[in-house]
Amino acid sequence: MKKRITQILFSLLTFCTNADIYAQENEKKTKNPWSGSVSLNYDFTNNFTGNVNLGYTQKNWDLFLDYSGHSDRIEISSELFRSFSAETSQLLETEQHHLSHSVAIQLDMRPSSRNLFLWNLKLQFPKITTNRDINNRTQTKEYDLHHRIAFSRKTIEGSLFYKHIYEKAKHELSLNGIFSHTKDSRPSTYQIDNLPTYTSSGNEKPKFVRLQMDYLYTFENQGQLETGIQFFSRWNKTRYNLHDTEETLDNWLSNLPLNDGINHHEYIYTAHLSYSRQQGEFWLYKIGLHADYDITRTKLMENTDKHNFDRFYFYPHLTLQYTPSDQQELAFHFTRKAAHPDYTQLNPFTNPIDHQTFEQGNPLLRPEITNRAEINYLLHGEKIQLNGNLYFNSTERFITPVTLFSEDNTLTLSYTNGSMENKVGLDINLSGSPTSWMTITPSISLVHAHANGKYQGINLHVDDFSWSGNLELNFNSKKHTEFQALFSYQSPTKVPQFKIEENYYLDLAIKQGFFNNRLQVSFSVSDVFDTSEWQARSNTDTYRLANYSKEATHAYWIGLTFNFNNFTSRSSADDSHPQKRQVIQLGQ
């Protein structure tokens, strides 16, 4: 499959090159409505990514087709040491194979200067196969374990957008609708000392729908009124089952707090209203209010427990902006927003990593509410641009990973709501061009965090200062040669229960353009010195826990990209790797 896809992409490169040459020869006769881009990136460990972007443009409508695919193997080495009622050491070797195909179709229609239609359809088919070998040592026993998970997902998402323009940017009405349906499958097998111990089967069917209407009106004094309503709903049905065998070790499976699944429904009704106006030559203000009525219905299938919540929230926002010149801008922003837990965090199924380590979501998580006040300063000149941001965040019921120990030394990775998390931070980004062929962009983020809360006797208190920084160098020549170096650093950071050690890496890339930059050849090295790693240690007196995880991030990539007929790059329908959520990293 991998070889065939590569051959297809190279064939497309050849076809597009010939098409571009033909188009140039006939450019004076007719304007070719086709444009596009084909790219292929390959590393030296048999991983690749590929993209095909095509556009067809007519007077009153445009059609776009995007394809993105990747196939890569990720190797992760992890260590976990724990000491609670006993000491346990684990060595884990994980190999994940990611295979993904994504397709997006977009149709833009402009039947008149006052009407705009947009239709979009996305299809995503990621598969992740995980093989994990674990050596587990206690003071009295030693086991060799093997865990295999075959995760697959099918997602279809469609959206429709309409805008009626009475007067551009002054008087407009827009309607928007989105529907998404996903089907997940997650069968797995587990062996201890080469003996089958259990199998599991699981599936989820998350869906969501969003309907929205927005209205913009400009008064004679140039003040703008924006208002709208929105309906959002998501629902999911999860079903997971564990099946043990006669070889089950110490009957550990029967002692788990298992849950077969969850039925979850959420309905959010929203209305918003805001008013903005330019006051004089230098000042602009915007004030608004956003209101949500949130209905949540949760049913646990194991014990038929129901947990229902009805909540009504107000979210005010305010902006004051001062622009003394074309080169400077000073602004104050206040916002209040809600962040809802996702289905990975809500799923109550107890997922075994090994017979002493488990993952389990928390179906009783509540949305976190963040109040944010910030002062932003922007300075942009001919050769320099400065962006500074001083902020204060206060998050009620902040969602955080939590690690639970039991008396038999069992470790459960879950989630909970803390009480309050406050952050004071400063972000500074400076971009300078000392010459026409060089750009230097240093950036730094400073943050002081204070959090508190308790969960099942666990203290979630944090009082910590940390910082991170990036340094990016770009060199560009007139002969379409580009060189980029990026160094990134993250200082040690404290989170509830743990201290995470520093992490840093260096990436290098060079790109050369040919045929007036239509064909681009690139070579890059990620994590040049192979320094990126994950280390976390417990910062409590109740138990000791240390986690080390090293992903094979050092890689060499070579890429080819061909643009024809002046194609303008657009965001592709790519599927990213799963987000890392837990503090304890074991190649999940």
Regions found by a protein language model. Give the residues of each.
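Outer membrane beta-barrel strand-and-loop segments of large Gram-negative receptors
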Residues: 91, 208-212, 255-259, 270, ...
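Extracytoplasmic loops and strand-loop junctions of Gram-negative outer membrane beta-barrel proteins
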Residues: 34-37, 84-91, 139-146, 157, ...
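Surface-exposed, low-complexity loop segments enriched in small/polar and acidic residues
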Residues: 126, 131-144, 172-204, 226-257
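Signature of Gram-negative outer-membrane beta-barrel scaffolds
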Residues: 225-328, 456
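Outer-membrane beta-barrel translocator domains and adjoining extracellular loop/strand segments
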Residues: 76-84, 130-139, 185-194, 238-248, ...
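Membrane-proximal, glycine/serine-rich, low-complexity loop/turn segments characteristic
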Residues: 1-133, 147-183, 214-232, 274-276, ...
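C-terminal extracellular loops and terminal segments
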Residues: 63, 321, 418-422, 439-502, ...
